[in-house]
Amino acid sequence: MRATSIAPLLCLLAVATPVLAQQDQPAIKLGGKTLELATTGEQRMQAKIDGEILEEDAFIEVETSFDDGSRGAAVLLVSDGGNGCPGNYVVISVDDGKAVATDPFGTCSDNAEASADQGIITVRFPPIGGRDGTVYHWSFAKGLEPPAAEPFQPKPGTSWANANALIGKYPWEALDNADVLAAFKALLGPDYETFTNYFGKGDPMDATPEGVIVGDCFDDSAEDSTNLLIGIDPTGKRVFVAMQDGGEAPRLYPAQEQWPASLQEQLKQWPQ
């Protein structure tokens, strides 16, 4: 049963939040005013201050906020309810009695970490699956700043020696191992960035009788589905990749005749 997803980047739990039943959320004080979330008769949600609708979506949730009495701000997770873009974020602020909202921002993922510290709101999409993260900052002084990249880094102390610890992990977690990450980059060359886009829904990885760690992913959110199969050979210090778009022939790295026998058997049954 394939139940977990990294996409769209990379978004684990990507479609979980917006489809939950809408629940009452407490009002929040911002700069002497009250931010309220209300549900309409059409089962949409509105964020309102003094009756003014500042944001309306299928789903709205307050992630974090701050208030110093004279001014304050809150960051909201918002979603139109579709699977193509599980969520974005909006900052609503009150200063000198005036309430304003930013345009929605984010990466179309609802897995950001939101925090407020000393009047600065940070919305961080952490690096995952070989992809860089994205960090947004908002403040009264600067408003919403352009996003900054947070480079992906493998976990310290990881190598071929502990690659077997990847068994039971999800396919995209293979890139948390420094040696495995380097091997995929060396194998794929300019196709590495494309490769990271193929991580979608997947099960925890297992190992073949030969000890090759194997995992697969698929993404059926678009018109043309994609499939990914990866193999990791800790003994031979090699990696293997198969990528497929829709009904097209898969692209294999390296050529199939160089794949271990047990992994070639996996290819015969893939995609499922």
Model-derived features with residue positions:
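Acidic, small-residue rich beta-repeat scaffolds with periodic aromatic anchors
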Residues: 22-37, 94-193, 229-272
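Structural motif
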Residues: 43-45, 80-92, 130-137, 225-227, ...
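Mid-chain, structured segments of secreted extracytoplasmic proteins
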Residues: 60-99, 217-221
